[in-house]
Curated annotation (Swiss-Prot):
It comes from Escherichia coli (strain 55989 / EAEC). HAMAP family: Leu_tRNA_synth_B. The keyword Cytoplasm applies. GO terms for cellular component: cytosol. This is Leucine--tRNA ligase. Its main location: cytoplasm. It is an enzyme of class 6 (ligase). Gene3D superfamilies: 2.20.28.290, 3.10.20.590, HUPs, Isoleucyl-tRNA Synthetase, Domain 1. Belongs to the class-I aminoacyl-tRNA synthetase family. It comes from the Bacteria.
Length: 860
């Protein structure tokens, strides 16, 4: 064994061994308990970043640990390979998205191997290949036949200059990112999947997910947004149709003083025919993209349509306004306004001088003061005719019942969740498998024409999708009739909604899933990824699983038993102010810093001499130029060091602060482990350990070894506090480094301890452990070695520490045998000088003894 720890030599050798032996390839095995460990698959952007490394290290630690417990562990990896960034990169680099993507995959695959992750590479998949997306296309046609897919018009961002649809992130300050033309909102037909048909199940089954973070479940509950309320119909004077609104507060209905409709509502459109002000307002709304997050903060505007609706219970006429805070795609595109008891309605009514009518008493029973704001709390009704004096619940039911009896109301359950729009007017995605026949009939692409292959050899102009620009691509024949293919592609969330299931049978040719393999491996035992995916991906992931279950492919209700959301990776961020006042961000690698005695940064400059402003730790990002390249760190310290630091520096679900000093510390620790094994093995063969012949000191050291095994097992397996597991191993290493190694049993005990340490470290630092296991002559490869088991007998304490008090004040701490009697403890306490001096010449009036813990002598 060489004396120096040289990761650059051992890591590549061990990785080659894993490749040649196919160590981590697995198949279904009914005789073994399975464990499916999955990290969210990466987008092949070109290089791994530290966020990836953290995510995949956590997954690999768990997978290797479970493997050592004797389970059949599946840990696959693949590539979420479709998406908009590839189009931009292709234009910039004068290539096509496909070669750019495949080059990135090859590069990043090598980076993953360099980090030593134990993946089953035989199951690797890329979502941009027809072998993958053909099954997604087939599944979509099946959903269409079941009535779970439909087409309707929906608003998109449209650049009139480029004649193209823009993704939200391509709209900068209301203008096209490419040509700076003002972006318009345009209604175009798009495909939707009915996720709302599963809303109740998606909501209720959150209660089954005991091992998902509460934050994620709460976010999904709010996103689904189930509410119970009443749908109310209003007659409108001089208008052919009625208006329908939905409210969760029918108890406030007697305070409804106006209605508001979306700018795109047919009533607003009709009113605009003779109202230029309204027509201009509708135009303004049409070209304003409004995300829900912006709705709360934007200025509320509106125009009176001139129409009057009739309040069904009071018979009063109330005005109908067009307002920018009502969206056509939400609910009915019309809302009732109760400005006395809703703050948004209050602000709008105050701005435009509309009637504000209070109908709920304040908590003290007085009439509410509405001079500054609405009263939004629930309470007792007044000013409400026959409903006066009713509390919230009674009023809700009474008003709902009356409206229902009159035929103008109906109790309804509503959801905030909208159906999933899966059409994207982009090129680099899976083609949507639908066709339109010459006679206008729309139908799914027949099975014998699947997959609809996306051509990869294309020229990108950065404006129009190549499959939209080429009229020939869309032409096909169905049932002998000319037809045109759909030229939109799927939302890339489609591919990432079912990849986890395809990993169980990536070569299967007969269908989307081989049910036998899928049901052996599924559900996923632990799924690891960022909390930013809480509502979109993780909701679609759950939805798709239920769709596949209902298609008979899987027999579980949920895709993953446990979800672990790893924290972000932070790094120092620095900038200097340029000549034009702009911020120039400088990589922390290039910052020369001065620190105070507490290690805090007090001054910084770069190599060019710029004084740098230190903004603290923030998420590693391109915008702040504070990302640290994992590859550079692996080349400098080795993969094991980077992995160990990642798992030690912070709990897995908390933010991690990147500190190179911490990386150096992890590296020093691994050098110490190497040195101890080197010194131990240099002394030659080791005798067998005789546990019955150990001295007290040897027993104490062996007790520490086995207590550490017990703690590390609990920390990794149950608590998933990996940082405390590593801390416990480090503490044990400090004791081993000081332990005597001269005697035969000293060395036998050291052998037992080092074999345990190397196995406990193996999930974290597999390359060094693989090598040290061989040097220690462990049995077989460490990858097939069992996890160490704590010896209960070894952990039993022979002695215990008893606190001795005189009149309640601590005077000594004594070590006594665990089976010592009260008399023996008193006798031993009396031998302590500090106790004896307080007992001299006094009478012991009372003795309080808590066996093995406390002796209190009361004297007087």
């Amino acid at each position: 064994m060489q004396e120096q720890y040289r990761p650059e030599e051992i890591e590549s050798k061990v990785q080659l061994h894993w490749d040649e032996k196919r160590t981590f390839e697995v198949t279904e095995d009914e005789s073994k308990e399975k464990y499916y460990c999955l990290s969210m698959l990466p987008y092949p952007s070109g290089r791994l970043h530290m966020g990836h490394v953290r995510n995949y290290t956590i997954g690999d630690v768990i997978a290797r640990y479970q493997r050592m417990l004797g389970k059949n562990v599946l840990q696959p990896i693949g590539w979420d390979a479709f998406g908009l960034p590839a189009e931009g990169a292709a234009v910039k680099n004068n290539t096509a998205p496909a070669p750019w993507t495949y080059d990135n995959i090859a590069y990043m695959k090598n980076q993953l191997k360099m980090l030593g992750f134990g993946y089953d590479w035989s199951r690797e998949l890329a979502t941009c290949t027809p072998e993958y997306y053909r099954w997604e296309q087939k599944f979509f046609t099946e959903l269409y036949k079941k009535g779970l897919v439909y087409k309707k018009t929906s608003a998109v961002n449209w650049c009139p200059n480029d004649q193209t649809v823009l993704a939200n992130e391509q709209v900068i300050d209301g203008c096209c990112w490419r040509c700076d033309t003002k972006v318009e909102r345009k209604e175009i037909p798009q495909w939707f999947i009915k996720i709302t048909a599963y809303a109740d199940e998606l909501l209720n089954d959150l209660d089954k997910l005991d091992h998902w973070p509460d934050t994620v479940k709460t976010m999904q509950r709010n996103w689904i947004g189930r509410s119970e309320g009443v749908e109310i119909t209003f007659n409108v004077n001089d208008y052919d149709n009625t208006l329908t609104v939905y409210t969760t507060r029918p108890d406030t209905f007697m305070g409804c003083t106006y209605l508001a409709v979306a700018a795109g509502h047919p009533l607003a459109q009709k009113a605009a025919e003779n109202n230029p002000e309204l027509a201009a307002f509708i135009d303004e709304c049409r070209n304003t993209k409004v995300a829900e997050a912006e709705m709360a903060t934007m200025e509320k505007k509106g125009v009176d349509t001139g129409f009057k609706a009739v309040h069904p219970l009071t018979g009063e006429e109330i005005p109908v306004w067009a307002a920018n805070f009502v969206l056509m795609e939400y609910g009915t595109g019309a809302v009732m306004a109760v400005p006395g008891h809703d703050q948004r309605d209050y602000e709008f009514a105050s701005k435009y001088g509309l009637n504000i009518k209070p109908v709920i008493l304040a908590a003290d029973g007085s009439e509410p003061d509405l001079s500054q704001q609405a009263l939004t709390e629930k309470g007792v009704l007044f000013n409400s005719g026959e409903f006066n004096g009713l509390d919230h619940e009674a009023a809700f039911n009474a008003i709902a019942d009356k409206l229902t009896a009159m035929g103008v109301g109906e109790r309804k359950v509503n959801y905030r969740l909208r159906d999933w729009g899966v059409s994207r007017q982009r090129y680099w995605g899976a083609p949507i498998p639908m066709v339109t026949l010459e006679d206008g009939t729309v139908m799914p692409t027949p099975d014998d024409q699947l997959p609809v292959i996306l051509p990869e050899d294309v020229v990108m102009d950065g404006i129009t999708s190549p499959i939209k620009a080429d009229p020939e691509w869309a032409k096909t024949t169905v049932n002998g009739m000319p037809a045109l293919r759909e030229t939109d592609t799927f939302d890339t969330f489609m591919e990432s909604s079912w990849y986890y299931a395809r990993y169980t049978c990536p070569e299967y040719k007969e269908g989307m899933l081989d049910s036998e393999a899928a049901n052996y491996w599924l559900p996923v035992d632990i799924y690891i990824g960022g909390i930013e995916h809480a509502i979109m991906h993780l909701l679609y992931f759950r939805f798709f699983h239920k769709l596949m279950r209902d298609a008979g492919m899987v027999n579980s209700d949920e895709p993953a038993k446990q979800l672990l959301c790893q924290g972000m990776v932070l790094a120092d961020a620095f900038y200097y102010v340029g000549e034009n006042g702009e911020r120039n961000w400088v990589s922390p690698v290039d910052a020369i810093v001065e620190r105070d005695e507490k290690g805090r940064i007090v001054k910084a400059k770069d190599a060019a001499g710029h004084e740098l402003v230190y903004t603290g730790m923030s998420k590693m990002s391109k915008s702040k130029n504070n990302g640290i390249d994992p590859q550079v760190m692996v080349e400098r310290y080795g993969a094991d060091t980077v992995r160990l630091f990642m798992m030690f520096a912070s709990p897995a679900d908390m933010t991690l602060e990147w500190q190179e000093s911490g990386v150096e510390g992890a590296n020093r620790f691994l050098k110490r482990v190497w040195k101890l094994v080197y010194e131990h093995t240099a002394k030659g063969d080791v005798a067998a350990l005789n546990v019955d012949a150990l001295t007290e000191d040897q027993k104490a050291l062996r007790r520490d070894v086995h207590k550490t095994i017990a703690k590390v097992t609990d920390d990794i397996g149950r608590r998933q506090t990996f940082n405390t597991a590593i801390a416990a191993i480090m503490e044990l290493m400090n004791k081993l480094a000081k332990a005597p190694t001269d005697g035969e049993q000293d060395r036998a005990l050291m052998q037992e301890a080092l074999l345990a340490v190397v196995r406990m470290l193996n999930p974290f630092t597999p390359h060094i452990c693989f090598t040290l296991w061989q040097e220690l002559k462990g049995e077989g490869d460490i990858d097939n070695a069992p996890w160490p088991v704590a010896d209960e007998k070894a952990m039993v304490e022979d002695s215990t520490l008893v606190v001795v008090q005189v009149n309640g004040k601590v005077r000594a701490k004594i070590t006594v045998p665990v089976d010592a009697t009260e008399e023996q403890v008193r006798e031993r306490a009396g031998q302590e000088h500090l106790v004896a001096k307080y007992l001299d010449g006094v009478t012991v009036r009372k003795v309080i003894y808590v066996p093995g813990k406390l002796l209190n002598l009361v004297v007087g």
